[in-house]
């Protein structure tokens, strides 16, 4: 019988392993929402405990404790920064409502009586006439300010890599997602036409933030001699809706995909043996060839209910280039 890492390496190289690999909580996009997790564990008679350092509190995604991951036979283990730095320290509660301002200066609130996750209430650049004007007063966080806290967190994660497929995971949402969070949804879409230079500058700052994060993570992994335990490098950007891409495919090819190409090239240079993973929801078939050309190896979540996302057709057209990772 193969161990988890051997099993995953086979599958990631388009070879047949001893069984289909299974991933639970190997990334922040393949985890499980807190409410669903609690119900599922109670139903199965398993522990309802989860990692107290919640990896993605905004989406209320939790990581089951190691004992549960072992019982559920998850082949993956995550290593990476928390999505909200110092979450337990910065959140406050008034009545049934939890509030926090993250290190991107976004205000989030969750009402325990009705919400399944945090909702965003403010955007740091929404008050300005343009992104260009806003960036004179606000800038993307400098990742160097958070490296020490990341190191403390990943030092606790590293012992659980074992013989599993280690996944180096991102520290924030994707390039378009972060742009939307920072500027606000309606204004960002308008800025693509009214302030294209500002929109590109914001994307550029987020790209550099991500590269700085990845390099700091790889530095630590290599200092600890753990690089052989890492098989996947996980990024994310929801580029699709149920019916189409989020913006025109040509705009994604011009604005977003070249920047992911830079991120993935950097990551491949640092960890040549590991595979580039991307989570992107929705109907994204038109841009899959572009993502492949940019360096994508693994596509998640394969939202087959979206337009033009037939599983058989996707496998026939892209199966030689992409590993399909559900969830």
Walk through the language-model features, giving the residues of each.
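Active-site loop segments of alpha/beta catalytic cores
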Residues: 1-41, 47, 101, 110-114, ...
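Segments that shape or occlude catalytic/ligand-binding pockets
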Residues: 33-87
